[in-house]
Amino acid sequence: MKKIVLLLTLCSIGVCASAGIMIYPKYLSLDDKTKSAEVTLINSSALESSNYRVTLSYKKQNPDGSYTEVTNEEEIPADSVTKILRYSPRSVMLKPSKSQTVRVLKRIPEGLEPGDYVGYITFTEVLLEKAATKENLDPKAFSVKLTPIPSFSIPIFVRYKVKENAHVSLETKGLVTKEGITSLSVVMKRQEQAKSKGPRLVARGDLSVWDGDQMIGYIKGRYMLPATDTLETQMPLYIPDAITNKEGQKENKYLTADELKGKTLKVLFTQANDEQLQKDKVLAQTEIKL
């Protein structure tokens, strides 16, 4: 039997692609006072075990917000964490209803420039091959089998000898309606010149859209990597918990372009906070009249 097996990697950033696997925290952050951090994987399945290979990687952030993994070592930029972090174990076996921790250790090489360093810790499931059967040993048969490989990543931020934040500005490109959802296109631009001296920093915070005192859009934990100068974000516009469904549960009411016509909206990029939006700690802002 002639069999072609295509391995498709289902990879997401911060979101597990394999059902039954949970991860905590959703990102790692190390500063001058922090030498190590831990990631915990939990197998919520009571029946199946899972095996994962653990790697450090660098992903290029594209202007549209997507990511491209850089596999050629010569193309990995200087702001990557891959050369300043160590981790163990390199593989994880998760038994049913069990958890395991991966420890990340920071080792600063001599002469490292101050700045923000970023990367991703990636967990890729190791699929076990099934034993061959009489049917699939038929030399005259031919088939193509697509095998998805569950994989997921979380970002790692390492800040070395810097305290200031990256300076960014915000611009808007108007409304975009796709698949029935109206969004506001927001562009974040870095203020530091790409060739200027000094460290390139991560811009990290929360994005929100306001119609007067009513928040109608929110993206928590938006960040622009040091090598990125322009980052566009599509922000769905809605009124939180404005509708009660038949089951008595609150749902968001998504706004249409007609409902927003003539309104002046304010966009805020505020200091990141794990608990709640800090509207009083504004890093950048802009307005748009629709």
What are the roles of these predicted feature ranges?
Residues 31-38, 101, 113-120, 180-184:
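Short, solvent-exposed loop/turn segments enriched in Ser/Thr/Gly
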Residues 48, 52-79, 189, 193-215:
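Short acidic, flexible loop segments centered on an aromatic residue
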Residues 57-59, 107-161, 243-290:
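Terminal connector regions
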Residues 24-30, 91-92, 171-177:
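Short beta-strand segments of immunoglobulin-like
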Residues 73-110, 213-257:
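Intrinsically disordered, low-complexity Pro/Gly/Ser/Thr-rich segments with frequent PxxP/GP/PP motifs
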Residues 38-42, 185-195:
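Short edge beta-strand/loop segments characteristic of extracellular beta-sandwich folds
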Residues 3-17:
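Sec-dependent N-terminal signal peptides
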Residues 18-37:
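N-terminal edge beta-strand
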